[in-house]
């Protein structure tokens, strides 16, 4: 698919950042092996990546596993082809950072109209956007929505793009808007059988921030079967359209708790505390149309 000049600018900036991030993380992971456990936290590959890339590091994120991760913003005006840029971002992330064809991408969309339009395009195997994803995955792309069955095997053998709609989050509606991650249908394969408390305890040691309950009469943990927990286990790449609408403190904590490896947001009006990777101006869009 033909990219416009400003879209090429975005993709090139993302490529450079992802390659720097991958190289830095790899070298830091090796260096950590030589350090005692109580000193390993002093090595922050994300901060070094920002410094190397000459980018401001304002939004310093830590996921639910206690690991730093990048949360980047692409500033692009409305009409700048964000869906195409999101697809290109998935391709570059898989190729340069994850370095694999499989995994989980959580694509968060802010409105019903944008949600239905985007899902329709990406589901259509004849659509150029879907074809770009299929090239990336080797024709093993699965498009899912909340409530549809998701298994560990799906993620291990395919590139799974899971669409979630979260409308604007404020202090007053935060808990209600984020209930989407409590959905409990179709995620059984991620969790041990209910009577295997030993395996539940083992999984909690690996992923300590999973939601769990302790059944009456026992102090043993029982991990909750939920979309949020399935995502936490999978350590996803998260894309957020109009990220300024889901950037309240409550929303950021929720995103952090999903244990992302990387978050990429799109916004025409990013907030001052966001990490902006690249800015596209209205003039650049206008010049492209001339």
Model-identified regions with their sequence ranges:
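RecA-like P-loop NTPase motor core of helicase/translocase proteins
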Residues: 1-290
């Amino acid at each position: 698919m033909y990219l416009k000049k400003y879209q090429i600018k975005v993709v090139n900036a993302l490529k450079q950042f992802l390659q720097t991030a991958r190289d830095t993380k790899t070298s830091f992971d090796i260096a950590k092996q030589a350090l005692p456990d109580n000193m390993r936290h002093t090595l922050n590959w994300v901060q070094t990546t920002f410094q190397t890339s000459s980018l401001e590091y304002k939004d310093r994120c830590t996921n639910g596993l206690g690991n730093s991760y990048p949360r980047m913003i692409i500033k692009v005006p409305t009409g700048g082809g964000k869906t195409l840029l999101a697809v290109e971002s998935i391709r570059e992330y898989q190729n340069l950072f994850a370095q694999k064809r499989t995994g989980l991408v959580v694509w968060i969309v802010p409105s019903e109209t944008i949600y239905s339009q985007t899902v329709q395009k990406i589901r259509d195997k004849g659509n150029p956007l879907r074809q770009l994803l299929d090239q990336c995955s080797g024709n093993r792309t699965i498009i899912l929505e909340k409530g549809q069955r998701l298994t560990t095997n799906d993620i291990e053998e395919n590139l799974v793009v899971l669409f979630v709609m979260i409308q604007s989050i404020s202090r007053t509606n935060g808990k209600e808007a984020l209930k989407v991650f409590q959905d409990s249908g179709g995620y059984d394969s991620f969790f041990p059988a209910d009577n295997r408390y030993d395996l539940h305890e083992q999984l909690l040691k690996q992923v300590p921030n999973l939601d769990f309950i302790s059944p009456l009469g026992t102090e043993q943990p029982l991990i909750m079967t939920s979309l949020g927990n399935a995502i936490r286990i999978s350590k996803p790449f998260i894309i957020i359209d109009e990220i300024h609408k889901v950037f309240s403190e409550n929303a950021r904590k929720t995103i952090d708790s999903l244990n992302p490896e990387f978050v990429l947001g799109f916004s025409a009006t990013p907030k001052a505390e966001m990490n902006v990777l690249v800015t596209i101006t209205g003039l650049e869009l206008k010049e492209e149309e001339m």
